[in-house]
């Protein structure tokens, strides 16, 4: 995984630089998201790993799956990756590009783990509070973990805010053992 990310990083940075210069970050995000989804497909992955298929043919097959949803630059990028035998890194290129894009836009990614499904109003209130605390726009991805018993855990970068019942109980257990 680390090796794949190392290989994917220069591609993601090059696409990001191009997108930024063209003031077209959103279109490139869509292009990479589509290409990553195609590359992650089980059937496509089996083609990518097939040594009997030439890189040119593989690039053409990949583009045919994408259909007409890619512009000329997106198509050229796919063909470049195919020629270099790098189509399998598209999911990582997409992920790294998204990180560069959100950093450029001043957006922080927040991973919110809740004991129960959150309503839209609850999530909006939480995001508003987090934006006030961090003084940046927050993009939240929510998951549910019933083991928390109640409350939420918020992970932003290397900071963890644990407001869960499980976290409080664990802290009490540590305090009682001391």
Curated annotation (Swiss-Prot):
Classification via InterPro entries: ATP_synth_OSCP/delta_N_sf, ATPase_OSCP/dsu
GO molecular function ontology, one term from the record: proton-transporting ATP synthase activity, rotational mechanism
Classification of source organism: Bacteria, Pseudomonadati, Pseudomonadota, Betaproteobacteria, Nitrosomonadales
Record family assignment: Belongs to the ATPase delta chain family.
Membrane topology recorded in Swiss-Prot or TrEMBL: Peripheral membrane protein
Subunit details: F-type ATPases have 2 components, F(1) - the catalytic core - and F(0) - the membrane proton channel. F(1) has five subunits: alpha(3), beta(3), gamma(1), delta(1), epsilon(1). F(0) has three main subunits: a(1), b(2) and c(10-14). The alpha and beta chains form an alternating ring which encloses part of the gamma chain. F(1) is attached to F(0) by a central stalk formed by the gamma and epsilon chains, while a peripheral stalk is formed by the delta and b chains.
Function, as annotated: F(1)F(0) ATP synthase produces ATP from ADP in the presence of a proton or sodium gradient. F-type ATPases consist of two structural domains, F(1) containing the extramembraneous catalytic core and F(0) containing the membrane proton channel, linked together by a central stalk and a peripheral stalk. During catalysis, ATP synthesis in the catalytic domain of F(1) is coupled via a rotary mechanism of the central stalk subunits to proton translocation.
PANTHER family named in the record: ATP SYNTHASE DELTA CHAIN
Name by which UniProt lists this protein: ATP synthase subunit delta
Compartment(s) where it occurs, according to its Swiss-Prot or TrEMBL record: Cell inner membrane
GO cellular component terms given for this protein: plasma membrane; proton-transporting ATP synthase complex
Pfam family, one: OSCP
Organism: Nitrosospira multiformis (strain ATCC 25196 / NCIMB 11849 / C 71)
Sorted UniProt keywords: ATP synthesis, Cell inner membrane, Cell membrane, CF(1), Hydrogen ion transport, Ion transport, Membrane, Transport
Domain of life: Bacteria
